[in-house]
Design a protein with these regions (language model features):
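Short helix-loop-beta junction
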Residues: 226-239, 330
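N-terminal secretory targeting modules
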Residues: 2-4, 10-13, 20-204, 379-384
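Short, solvent-exposed loop/turn and secondary-structure capping segments
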Residues: 182-183, 217-221, 276
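Alpha-helical cap/lid subdomain in secreted, periplasmic
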Residues: 1, 5-6, 89, 250-385
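Intrinsically disordered, low-complexity acidic regions
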Residues: 214, 219, 235-238, 248-251, ...
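Surface-exposed cleft-lining segments at the edges of enzyme active sites
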Residues: 211-216, 238-244, 271-283
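Catalytic nucleophile-elbow at a beta strand-turn-alpha helix junction centered on a G-D-S/GDSL motif
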Residues: 202-226
Length: 385
């Protein structure tokens, strides 16, 4: 095996958008060309393998992390529930966007956890990757292939023929993390970051919420509604959905506020209750929501915030938690708050039960309708045409 030169142009991470300036690990190649050379190795088949740490990545909002692909910083304290602290290793919402002149692209990755699937969500969604190509004539991303982790090997691999110069997007696993990721290209091929988006939105839309925001239960990563909104609106996203654990602790508002976002989307109601109705310790809307949103607005004044109701499979209208945040929304608007968008659950599901796997979590049909509802709210918040 020998080292090979690699041209990496404009590599950047969303971590540059954090309020605190950290050394950009993903930009090492930009500052030290020797590191870029050493990061690419040619195997016996003539494939040049590049570590994912040197690829243009999005959805990775922090650099002060325990593991490179973590969604939250290493200093998350016990003031945040254990579910979040454990699932911060999941790569939901993370993706690579780049252009290459290689005629074939190869991928291999090692998942963080050996649990690669769930009873109601396949391994392709939990631990797989999705590859998309940009169609310039039609002005949209098209799905090319999905890579899965082999149960026996506990590793994933995928090889795809490619039209040189075509932009590529790779969604990472939803309910698993990545310990190692590598892109394989032809020996003399190059990789370049894509130019700024035509939408004009280059700061991320940050989604914070529950298992549904996390991506449960899409059959593959690209179909999760957060990822669909990103592609459909041509905006970068950060996915901070935490299964059963999106409960709006005050500390989480501090972490979100560190991200230099274009918009925040709050979608936590499924994991929360009301103290007046028995509630749940540490999970009550009437205790957590208002301090959370006020702190977020204080730290990021002027950044639009979307307040979402909880999705209801049967579309029965607002429940007590929805009515609570509607009253809070009206209160904040009366105080003079601007750039605040309210998202009712009216269009999140079709109402016929076809959009869910278990009367709660959306399947791919449900994810499509969710993406349209949330996409419309984000479009309104960002004033996109």
């Amino acid at each position: 095996m020998k080292l090979a030169n690699i041209k990496v142009v404009g590599v950047a991470t969303l971590a540059t958008m954090c309020a605190c300036a950290f050394a950009q690990e993903g930009e090492i190649a930009k500052w030290d060309s020797r590191m870029a050379i050493e990061s690419a190795v040619i195997d016996t088949n003539g494939v040049k393998w590049i570590d994912g740490k040197y690829l243009p990545i999005e959805g990775r909002a922090f650099d002060d992390v325990e593991h490179f692909y973590d969604r939250l910083p290493a200093n998350v304290t016990t003031n945040v529930n254990g579910g979040v602290r454990g699932m911060k290793h999941h790569t939901s919402g993370m993706l690579f966007r780049f252009k290459t002149d290689s005629k074939r692209i190869n991928f291999k990755w090692q998942p963080y956890s050996s649990v690669i699937s769930m009873h109601h969500m396949p391994s392709t969604g939990v631990s797989g990757i999705d590859v998309y190509r940009w169609d310039a004539k039609k002005g949209r991303w098209f799905h090319v292939s999905t890579g899965a982790v082999k149960e026996a090997e506990k590793r994933g691999s995928l090889s795809v023929s490619w039209t040189p110069g075509t932009p590529c997007l790779v969604n990472l696993p939803l309910y698993n993390g990545v310990r190692e990721f590598k892109l394989g290209i032809e020996t003399n091929a190059t990789v370049e970051a894509l130019p700024p988006r035509k939408s004009g939105i280059n700061k991320p839309v940050v989604f914070y919420g529950t298992s549904i925001t996390h991506g449960g239960c899409a059959s593959r990563p690209g179909l999760a509604f957060v990822n669909r909104v990103g592609r459909d609106l041509d905006v970068p996203v950060v996915g901070l959905g935490f299964s059963g654990s999106g409960v709006m602790e005050f500390e989480m508002s501090e972490h979100l506020a560190r991200i230099d976002a274009s918009c925040y989307v709050l979608d936590c109601l499924w994991n929360m209750g009301l103290s007046t109705l028995g509630g749940y310790a540490g999970r009550n809307l009437d205790e957590n929501y208002e301090p959370f949103i006020r702190n977020l607005r204080a730290k990021r004044p002027g950044v639009p915030i979307v307040m979402a109701e909880h999705c209801d499979v049967l579309c029965r209208g607002p429940d007590s938690t929805d009515r609570f945040i509607r009253a809070l929304y009206d209160k904040l608007v009366a105080e003079g708050w601007k750039n605040l968008v309210y998202l009712p659950n009216t269009d999140m599901y079709s109402g016929d039960g076809e959009g869910t796997v278990d009367t709660c979590h959306p399947n791919d049909i449900g994810m499509e309708s969710m993406s349209k509802a949330f996409g419309a709210a984000v479009r309104k918040a960002l004033k996109l045409k």
